[in-house]
Amino acid sequence: MARYIGPKCKLSRREGTDLQLKSGVKPFDVKTKKHAKAPGQHGQARGKQSEYSLQLREKQKVRRMYGVLERQFSNYYKEAARVKGATGENLLKLLESRLDNVVYRMGFGSTRAEARQLVSHRSITLNGRRVNIASIQVKAGDVIAVHEGAKQQLRIKNAIELAAQRGIPAWMDVDHSKLEGTFKAAPDRSDLPAEINESLIVELYSK
């Protein structure tokens, strides 16, 4: 399945929640005020959804939020089910530990898509080495930094300003003056987005 390159707000409207695909300069309700309904000819008609439909929508919502393709998401679920612990929580931890997401959470990218681009352009270092694979799983103690040659990029400076408003997660130590941060540990479920109902995803894959 190809990566979606259309209007980002359209995806958020489809899921009925802010997927954090835009920078956050404007609140979600302001950005979508003109198109408050779900996209499509019958967007306003949100009838009662079946159990399967709710499960599928939740999976699509999370997949789009983290910018992960269908096959990648399926592989993450298999890994989450294989290791010890609650499968749904394990899945979210794997997604949150992706390098592109960590770069975003640390405030070096204004969106996950921008953070992914920074990684692919080799503007990010992991433990002192330049990397270009957005899906790398960051481990506790890993140090992520902006490469010296990219430190003057205006988009990174803008992202840091936005991060100051958004806040930095407790499971990271970030020094924006040095443009580097340390991933202290994988987050607890209480630290993760409350609007995600991972149990629906587990139910979907358990069929």
From Swiss-Prot:
The Gene Ontology terms for molecular function here are: rRNA binding; structural constituent of ribosome
How is this protein named in the record?
Small ribosomal subunit protein uS4
Q: How does it assemble?
A: Part of the 30S ribosomal subunit. Contacts protein S5. The interaction surface between S4 and S5 is involved in control of translational fidelity.
Q: Which UniProt keywords apply?
A: Ribonucleoprotein, Ribosomal protein, RNA-binding, rRNA-binding
* Pfam families in UniProt: Ribosomal_S4, S4
Q: Where is this region: Disordered?
A: 26-53
Write down the SUPFAM superfamilies for this protein, in alphabetical order: Alpha-L RNA-binding motif (SSF55174)
- Residue ranges of every copy of the S4 RNA-binding domain listed in the record: 97-159
What PANTHER family does this protein's entry cite?
30S 40S RIBOSOMAL PROTEIN (PTHR11831), SMALL RIBOSOMAL SUBUNIT PROTEIN US4M (PTHR11831:SF4)
Keyword Nucleotide-binding appears in the UniProt entry:
no
CDD domains noted in UniProt: S4
UniProt function note: One of the primary rRNA binding proteins, it binds directly to 16S rRNA where it nucleates assembly of the body of the 30S subunit.
SMART domains given for it? Ribosomal_S4, S4
Q: Which PROSITE patterns match?
A: RIBOSOMAL_S4, S4
A biological process (GO) of this protein is:
translation
What family name appears in the similarity comment?
A: Belongs to the universal ribosomal protein uS4 family.
Record-linked HAMAP family:
Ribosomal_uS4_B
- Ribonucleoprotein as a keyword of this entry, yes or no, is yes
Q: Which GO terms describe its cellular component?
A: small ribosomal subunit
Classify the source by domain of life. Answer: Bacteria
